[in-house]
Structure formats: structure tokens, C-alpha cells
Amino acid sequence: MKKIISIIALVLLQISCYAVIIETTANLNVYYPEYTKIDLVCGQMPKAAQKDVEFCCEAAFTGELLNEFKHSNIADNHICNGEMKKGYRCKANTGGFVWGKGKWKFMRKADYPTEANGWNIGFCQLLIIKDGIVRAIGSKMKNNRNIYRALCEKDGKLCIIESKKVMTYEFFVKCLNTYKVTHALYLDMGRGWNYAWYREKGGKVKEIFPESKLAPSYKYRTNWITFYK
């Protein structure tokens, strides 16, 4: 009996040790996954039945609305499970992110690696903030209104930050800067693309924008940044 109780206690401890911690500001929801591994999952979104997944959401842009998955339909070269995959060239991307063995880098696209070189995940996107400095915002984009999401570093921790409501891109960037993130990289959004989910302490799954599963574009999603416990 003592052995059974010990096993149950250990399982409960393991569950409680990993969860997504949420902070909020007046305009932002901030998700801090407690993780041991990050990967770019391609082709099919991780399922809630995968108990080791803590958080997953869309990452890189998808090119065309195809009925079959192709790595070449993901914007720019990307690293999945330690392997570099060839994507299509995307001029809109200005930065990138890589992670491996507990270390990560946000970078300009010009510095994005040509080979995996030990990185477990990598993808390119629009670089919003680098080393605490806001990057130039294009005049065509600054007044675009949407709910936005970004992969960020804040006080030495990785987090996913999302606007609480529809706002201009320029204001979203201002909110990130006010929150004092060190780095920020855009994540793909829009109806269908914005669906995400995370795991609360205790293992319960919480969906973000579950209504997007009904959007026509939902089935065309291609890649997800995924945090594992």
C-alpha cells in the first residue's frame, strides 16, 4: 500500500511541477510554459492526449492553402526535431528563433543558420523587438487591426504574449515594449490560424480561440511551436 501511495504522490508531483503560468496586463495575456523541450511540430497539431505537451500554437507563415502538407509550404527554412527543412523564401520575414539543449537565440534573418547544428527547433518570422530595441514598423502594417501573438523573452524566460483584444499592430508593439521584453518574434495569427491550447496545473487543457476550429482556413495550418514538459 505504501508503495502505491508513493507512486501516486510522485505522479501528482510530476503533474503539478509543469504547467503554463499566466500573467496579465491591461492589454496582454502572457503565457510562461514550464518546459524541458521545444520543437516545431509540422503537418499535424499536437493533440491534447499527448500528456507531455504544455503549450502549442502556430509559428511560421503558411504559403498556399494546400490539402496536403509540404515543408516547402512553410515560410523559409525551418528546423523540426533537429533537422533542417527547406521552406519557401519569404521577404516579409526579418528574423528568426532557434532553441536547443536549453539555450536559444533570437536573431536577424541574415544570421539565421543554414544547418541545424544541434538546434532542435528553428523558424523565421517578423522580428518585432531585438535586444530591447523596437524594429522598424512598415507603414502598411502599423495600422492593421487584429489580435496579435508573439514569442518573446522576458527577464531571461521564454513566453508567448497575446493581445487581449483587437488592436493596431503598432499599439501591440508598444504594449510589448512597455512590458519590457528583450526580444519578440511575430507568430502567425488570423481566424483559424490563431487556435492554440495549453495545459493548466493538474493537466487540464485550455483552448485559446476554440471557435477558430470552425474557420475554413483551420485545416490549412502547417506548423506549431510546441513546449514539452
Q: What residues fall within each predicted segment?
A:
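Sec-dependent N-terminal signal peptides
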Residues: 4-13
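Gly/Ser/Thr/Pro-rich low-complexity, intrinsically disordered segments
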Residues: 17-229
